[in-house]
A protein has these predicted regions:
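Short active-site neighborhood of thiol/selenol oxidoreductases, capturing the structured segment around
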Residues: 18-48, 54, 58
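Short loop/turn microsegments at loop-to-beta-strand junctions
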Residues: 3-4, 28, 130-132
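Structural microenvironment flanking redox-active thiols in thiol-disulfide oxidoreductases
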Residues: 42-90
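N-terminal "domain-start" segment that seeds a small globular fold
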Residues: 1-20, 42
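A short, polar/charged loop-to-alpha-helix boundary motif
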Residues: 151-166
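Thiol/selenol-based redox catalytic cores and closely related redox-interacting motifs
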Residues: 82-152
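A generic fold-level signal
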Residues: 13, 23-24, 128
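Residue-level signal for short, function-critical loop segments
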Residues: 34-35, 61, 139, 148
Length: 167
């Protein structure tokens, strides 16, 4: 699979070719669910350690919402605002079924995160959309793809670190 040749809008409002992010070095592209997703907030907390790595986060918020969320969550990475889910669609990310979004196991996982200090936020975006992570090589080849199997299926910081080390 090749990364799409497309222009994206950043949290700053600036537009940029997606290929500019992987030109010369691999890119880890992380697609988040909605801003209130406790599992995404857990993943963001783990991604904060990678301040200098080439990681870009994609969300469904409008530019100002994305910028505000980035500040509130202290996200060091660049964020792409994709309220129409065009980039989600280009990477074949899909909406989850009822069982992938709501079930007893996910409820228990959410409670555990709440007890651990993570917080739910306001729902902004499609609550049924599942997340994903992709590694894009400098030639545009997508060498790794992770499609979430449910709303809690996000790559850990350790898994992201391994992706960064791939040659």
């Amino acid at each position: 699979m090749q990364a799409p040749l497309t222009v994206v809008t950043l949290d700053s409002g600036e537009t940029k070719d997606l290929k500019d992010f992987y030109n010369g070095k691999p890119l880890i592209l992380v697609f988040l669910r909605h801003f209130g997703c406790i599992f995404c907030r857990e993943q963001i907390a783990e991604l904060r350690q990678f301040k200098t790595e080439n990681i870009v986060l994609v969300c469904m918020g409008r530019v100002q919402e994305t910028s505000d969320f980035k500040k509130k969550m202290e996200i060091p990475q660049t964020m792409i605002s994709d309220p129409n889910k065009l980039l989600y669609e280009a990477f074949s990310l899909r909406r989850g079924s009822f069982g992938q979004v709501i079930n007893p196991t996910l409820t228990r996982k959410s409670i555990k995160l709440l007890k651990g200090g993570h917080k739910l936020g306001i729902l902004k975006g499609d609550p049924w959309m599942l997340a994903g992570v992709f590694r894009i090589e400098p030639d545009g080849d997508v060498s790794y793809s992770h499609y979430a199997t449910d709303v809690s299926d996000n790559l850990s910081g350790a898994a992201i670190a391994q992706l960064l080390k791939l040659k």
